[in-house]
């Protein structure tokens, strides 16, 4: 069976997602196409589009799947959503949103890279912004004396450097305004590290509240002019989940308790990552087999 995998090389999560999917589908004849450059596309049994679409290429494939992160769906993409046979999403929250627009929306979950590599305990905190505009870095700047902030817009991290930072820091702050999943959070957990995260829908679905530190949501906004992620009306499903600053401050004022929690629960945190990753990989594979 031939599968064409289409993705836009954004230099971050989408690229990793495409690699993960191609590796998982090793039993099939898979070709990956970076649609940010010109390509000659073959005909296939199944086309899988990750976030970005090429409407003119759908006819090359007998069936087509669209994998979406709902917060990045544009009006253009929404206008073509019914051209696809199936829509894959990462959570029941997203399924409920998009089932109003398509009859075959399937929650396949998500899976991330296992970054475990001889983790150490340094009693340090990290906020890995990467290139993202939705990690709520504005919140963490107020605590930069206590937290290392890595911004890929200013300093590029190699793959080895990224793995080193994930394994070196005991606590990772990921109070995202919104995520349809969240590679950073899961990759940190793969190293047995404690994550402080916002109580947004997808995190609540998949995370064990006994193994992470949730920060309650105080307000939800569609538009906030001072936040790049929310300073637009171009994305129908985009919302910003703002955490309770007081509760966040309370957590950071008890860092020693957090470090002890991480050390005590490290193995269980990693096992939770492994369990969810395995379950969602199986679900994805079984769904592909059903469709083909």
Question: What is each of the regions a protein language model found here?
Answer:
Residues 194-197, 204:
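Short hydrophobic beta-strand element within catalytic cores of glycosyltransferases
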Residues 76-78, 99-100, 110-124:
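Acidic anion/phosphate-binding donor-loop and adjacent secondary structure
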Residues 232-290:
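A charged, aromatic-enriched C-terminal amphipathic alpha-helix characteristic of glycosyltransferases
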Residues 177:
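Aromatic "clamp/platform" in nucleotide-sugar-dependent glycosyltransferases that forms part
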């Amino acid at each position: 069976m031939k599968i064409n995998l289409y993705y836009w090389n954004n230099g971050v999560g989408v690229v990793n997602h495409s690699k993960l999917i191609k590796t998982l589908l090793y039993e099939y004849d898979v070709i990956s196409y970076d649609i940010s450059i010109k390509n000659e596309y073959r005909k296939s049994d199944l086309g899988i589009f990750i976030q970005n679409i090429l409407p003119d290429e759908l006819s090359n494939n007998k069936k087509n799947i669209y994998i979406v992160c709902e917060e990045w769906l544009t009006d253009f993409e929404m206008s073509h959503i019914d051209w696809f046979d199936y829509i894959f999403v990462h959570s029941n929250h997203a399924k409920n949103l998009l089932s109003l627009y398509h009859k075959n929306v399937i929650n396949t979950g998500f899976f991330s890279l296992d970054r475990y590599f001889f983790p150490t305990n340094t009693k340090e905190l990290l906020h890995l912004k990467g290139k993202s505009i939705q990690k709520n870095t504005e919140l963490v700047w107020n605590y930069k004396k206590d937290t290392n902030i890595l911004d890929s817009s200013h300093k590029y991290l190699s793959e080895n450097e990224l793995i080193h930072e994930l394994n070196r820091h005991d606590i990772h702050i990921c109070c995202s305004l919104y995520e349809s999943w969240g590679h950073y959070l899961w990759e940190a957990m793969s190293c047995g590290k404690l994550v402080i995260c916002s109580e947004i829908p997808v995190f609540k679905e998949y995370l064990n509240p006994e193994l992470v530190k949730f920060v309650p949501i105080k307000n939800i906004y569609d538009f906030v002019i001072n936040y790049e992620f929310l300073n637009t009306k171009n994305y129908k499903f985009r919302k910003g989940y703002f955490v309770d600053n007081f509760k966040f401050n309370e957590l950071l004022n008890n860092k020693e308790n957090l470090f002890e929690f991480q050390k005590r629960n490290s193995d269980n945190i990693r096992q939770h990552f492994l369990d969810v990753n395995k379950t969602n990989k199986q679900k994805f594979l079984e769904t592909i087999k059903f469709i083909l």
